[in-house]
């Protein structure tokens, strides 16, 4: 893959070998909760990097410039690019590769990729990286199969992933699928965040639990239990009203989620064909 793309690690904000003293490092002097001036850039976390899309919700800014430990090339924070989350998760563990054209900066929570060939589209690379086949390959080539938590994708290993070079015309169906996945995931994110804002506003919650953030994955009874954990008790009439709201919004989210899953399977089929897998080989990939 390093033959077709440029890579960068995330920013290293602080480095004692670059002259940063203990006070600067301890107080995180280059970080801020607000955009103080034009040198402060929006900083994402690993959670922002999802499969196919990058959540642009910002909690922090970083003062970007020569004073940083390692500032990296600025094009990796502004140009159309792929971002890979360093920590991979799930059962089986999956690569989280997202695409963005927004001005977003990141530290060592991941790394960036930009195609260095006009004949290779970033979105084509994105689809291959998120495919089941490439996840299978990465898992058995580079991961510790005995370890469940905190597995990582390393930039050195990503550079070795076998991305097939095909014509721009042949890439077009993959690019179209990438665009569809970007649209669907953004739609799901907006639906989810709208409901989260409703919960936060209605119940005056400072922060939602992880399960409440993923409310559309819950059944209504589980949703009520999560509210109770946040010390929110619904009276019978309120519960009936919330059940109607919850089920309506969950149905909307499920429709989008199902379309994402269906498109994912279509992509996997296209990638199997691209790499010439037999039926037996496909079965091995999908069962593992």
Please provide the spans of the model-predicted regions.
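Non-catalytic DNA-recognition/assembly elements of restriction-modification systems
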Residues: 1-25, 47-49, 160-288
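Polybasic, glycine- and aromatic-enriched phosphate-binding surface used to engage nucleic acids
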Residues: 1-176
């Amino acid at each position: 893959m390093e033959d077709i793309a440029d890579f960068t690690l995330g920013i290293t904000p602080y480095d004692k070998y670059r002259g940063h003293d203990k006070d600067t490092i301890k107080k995180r002097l280059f970080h801020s909760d607000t955009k103080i001036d034009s040198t402060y850039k929006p900083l994402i976390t690993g959670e922002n990097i999802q499969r196919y899309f990058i959540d642009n919700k910002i909690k922090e800014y970083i003062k970007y410039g020569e004073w940083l430990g390692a500032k990296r090339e600025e094009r990796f924070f502004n140009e159309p690019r792929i971002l890979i989350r360093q920590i991979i998760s799930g059962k089986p563990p999956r690569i989280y590769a997202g695409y963005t054209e927004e001005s977003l900066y990141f530290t060592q929570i991941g790394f960036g990729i930009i195609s260095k060939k006009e004949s290779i589209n970033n979105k084509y690379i994105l689809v291959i990286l998120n495919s089941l086949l490439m996840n299978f390959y990465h898992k058995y080539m580079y991961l510790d199969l005995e370890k469940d938590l905190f597995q990582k994708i390393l930039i050195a290993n990503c550079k070795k992933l076998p991305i097939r070079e095909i014509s721009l015309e042949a890439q077009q169906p993959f690019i179209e699928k990438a665009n569809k996945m970007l649209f669907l995931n953004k739609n799901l994110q907006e639906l989810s965040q709208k409901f989260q804002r409703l919960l936060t506003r209605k119940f005056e919650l400072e922060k939602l639990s992880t399960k409440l953030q993923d409310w559309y994955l819950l059944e209504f009874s589980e949703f009520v239990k999560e509210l109770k954990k946040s010390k929110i008790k619904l009276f019978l009439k309120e519960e009936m009203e919330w059940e109607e709201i919850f089920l309506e919004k969950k149905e909307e989210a499920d429709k989008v989620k199902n379309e994402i899953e269906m498109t994912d399977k279509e992509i996997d089929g296209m990638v199997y064909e691209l790499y010439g897998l037999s039926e037996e080989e496909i079965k091995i990939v999908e069962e593992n």
